[in-house]
Design a protein with these regions (language model features):
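Acidic-aromatic substrate-binding/catalytic surfaces of carbohydrate-active enzymes
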Residues: 12-65
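Extended, loop-rich substrate-binding clefts of extracytoplasmic carbohydrate-active enzymes
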Residues: 64, 68-112
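Active-site/ligand-binding surface loops and adjacent short beta/alpha elements
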Residues: 130, 138-220
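Acidic, contiguous internal or C-terminal segments within carbohydrate-active enzymes
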Residues: 93-139, 144
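Acidic/His-leaning functional-site neighborhoods
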Residues: 11, 27, 66, 71, ...
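Beta-strand-rich interaction surfaces with strong enrichment in secreted/lumenal proteins
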Residues: 106-108, 258-263
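Generic N-terminal segment detector
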Residues: 1-30, 255, 276-280
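Short Pro-Gly-centered flexible turn/kink motifs
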Residues: 59-66, 261-278
Length: 280
């Protein structure tokens, strides 16, 4: 593992080659990212080729079963560092015993007045590549300098949501957000993440009185998750996902998973999200 720094003026980011994981995001040397301490030892893992898990942690394909952990293997893998500063994870013996497909996943980090995280999924095989891809950045809660309630807000949508507890639950339920404003409470996360698929535009702002404003844009992603631990955790995750996790009780070939991306042989798909921080 090795740390790599990207910076432009006031904004700097550090990325670990282990997992291609964002480890630090600072504005004027003030840290806004969770420090990966207990009770959640991550800061911004890359979720691939799964989001959440499959029943029994087993992936099925062409009549075979493969053991694969929740959120996939990308976050626990050592990534190659390319000459242009991007990170790459490619199919190997270690991945094929979990996920029998030929792929390359490249992640780049660009810092201007915001951090942009770009993921390129390449299908190097001769059959469609099934996958889910997600970001999982965790931000400090409370934010530096905050003096009041924290909220995540957006312009339109979000009156209803979905949840995934042991798999994606069927149907929608009312959201605790009011008029595009979700005032954060730990109790909201007693049953895992709040999942939204209808926010327009695809951008949310996380802030509190006295604190900076963090705006996350996720135009290339279908779902946004908001999650924290319900107890003992000083962070909130704002997570862009390519799709929903497996529904409860799913028992089929990975290519039949509802919402799965199927990338044609030889093709590439790009997903980007950005984080902008405006000072208090």
């Amino acid at each position: 593992m090795s740390l790599h720094t990207f910076g432009s003026g006031r904004l700097t980011a550090q990325v670990d080659s282990l997992g291609a994981q964002l480890r630090s995001l600072c504005l004027d040397d003030v840290e806004f990212l969770w420090n990966a301490a207990d009770p959640w030892n991550w800061s911004a893992p890359v979720l691939f080729p799964l989001i959440s898990g499959l029943p029994g942690d087993e992936l099925q394909h062409n009549g075979q079963r493969y053991s694969i952990p929740s959120h996939g293997f990308a976050r626990r893998s050592e990534w190659a560092v390319l000459e242009d500063g991007r990170f790459e994870l490619a199919a190997s013996e270690a991945t094929r015993v979990q996920y029998p497909f030929e792929f390359r996943l490249q992640v780049g980090f660009t810092v201007t007045d915001r951090l942009t995280v770009t993921h390129e999924v390449h299908n190097d095989g001769d059959e469609p590549l099934p996958y889910l891809l997600g970001g999982h950045p965790a931000f400090r809660w409370p934010l530096p300098g905050a003096t009041g309630e924290h909220e995540v807000s957006w312009s339109q949508g979000g009156e209803s949501m979905r949840q995934a507890v042991g798999g994606l639950r069927p149907g929608r339920i009312p959201s605790p957000a009011i008029d595009g404003r979700l005032v954060l409470q730990k109790s909201y996360f007693a049953e895992d993440a709040l999942l939204f698929d209808d926010l327009q535009p695809k951008a949310v702002t996380y802030t509190a009185p006295g604190a900076a404003r963090l705006t996350l844009r996720y135009d290339d992603f279908a779902v946004l998750g908001i999650w924290s631990k319900s107890q003992g955790a000083d962070f909130v995750c704002i997570e862009p996902w390519s799709g929903y996790p497996a529904p409860q009780g799913f028992d089929g070939d990975i290519t039949m998973l509802p919402g799965i991306e199927l990338l044609s042989a030889g093709q590439t798909h790009t997903f980007s999200y950005s984080i902008a921080i405006e000072g208090a």
